[in-house]
Amino acid sequence: MNIFLANPRGFCAGVDRAINIVKNAIEIYGPPIYVYNEVVHNKYVVNSLKKIGSIFVKKICDVPEKSILIFSAHGVSKSILKEANKRKLIIFDATCPLVSKVHHEIKRASKLRSEVIIIGHKNHPEIIGTIGQYNNPNKKVFVIQSIEEICKLKIKDPNNLFYFTQTTLSVDDTNKIIFAIKKKYPYIIEPRKKDICYATENRQKSIKKIIKLVDIIFIIGSKNSSNSNRLFEIANKSGKKSYLIDTYKEIKKSWLNGVNNIGITAGASAPEILVQQVVNYLKIFYKNSVNIYQVDGDIEKTKFMIPKKLILKIK
């Protein structure tokens, strides 16, 4: 039995930063620490942080006044920030810096009162937070996730139009949508840099490499993780048996019948411990008759600093 491990896989710099912000805040201030939305979309991570004193909330009014509040890696709207400030909360922002970059861009479009097309999933926290950077977005900001939706757009001024994208989309699918948008709106203003993040792109490239080598692919990630779902879609479209799993406990023995080569990757919010647990499960299942191969991919050196307040407290 051969196991092929995709590289890079698992935590990206933004996820790593967000988790460290929560952990450091708990260490410095003591529990409880409140977190608005899941800090990252992974069950294992969220449950681990709950055990050490994190309380995850969906409403700012559920946070006691003057408590410590952390915004998730997906970012929040300006209205949420305003509400948190009204409650005199001590705020630490774990928004991924690459999401913050998109926020800055849409704020610029808002100042110009430009119309905006956002490519992304309407109900995803990142999109909700991004739309919330635009003042009075009604009839100004349009969210689409397919080429078919472009023809339904009612753009008033194609010469004063921007587009942005969610950071965790399929690179291939998004490029097709962008091509179609630019064909219909040739004067649309592009982001200064592409919005899909390096980690999303690298993990999609790495899964394409192992697809060619395996009979079955396990994508480790939670069902509400956008980037993990995109990895699953890529694998599934290839025709290979593909499974999105949170842990090794979800693996059914019947999936492994007649399988000689197994591929494993993990979404950007899934910790390496879950990968190793899957590998260990397979070792036991195949009675240690297993060869493990690391499939080379892009080397990631990006690191994001945690807020200065937390760094100063640690010192």
Curated annotation (Swiss-Prot):
Question: Which CDD domains does the record cross-reference, listed alphabetically?
Answer: lytB_ispH (cd13944)
**Which residues participate directly in catalysis?**
126
Where along the chain is dimethylallyl diphosphate bound? 41, 74, 124, 225-227, 269
Record key words, sorted: 4Fe-4S, Iron, Iron-sulfur, Isoprene biosynthesis, Metal-binding, Oxidoreductase
Q: Per the annotation, how and in what number is the cofactor bound? A: Binds 1 [4Fe-4S] cluster per subunit.
Known pathway: Isoprenoid biosynthesis; dimethylallyl diphosphate biosynthesis; dimethylallyl diphosphate from (2E)-4-hydroxy-3-methylbutenyl diphosphate: step 1/1; Isoprenoid biosynthesis; isopentenyl diphosphate biosynthesis via DXP pathway; isopentenyl diphosphate from 1-deoxy-D-xylulose 5-phosphate: step 6/6
One GO biological process term: isopentenyl diphosphate biosynthetic process, methylerythritol 4-phosphate pathway
What is the uppermost EC class here? oxidoreductase
Q: Which GO terms describe its molecular function?
A: 4 iron, 4 sulfur cluster binding; 4-hydroxy-3-methylbut-2-enyl diphosphate reductase activity; metal ion binding
Source taxon at top rank: Bacteria
Q: Where does isopentenyl diphosphate bind?
A: 41, 74, 124, 225-227, 269
Q: Which family does it belong to?
A: Belongs to the IspH family.
Protein name per the record:
4-hydroxy-3-methylbut-2-enyl diphosphate reductase
In which organism is this protein found?
Answer: Wigglesworthia glossinidia brevipalpis
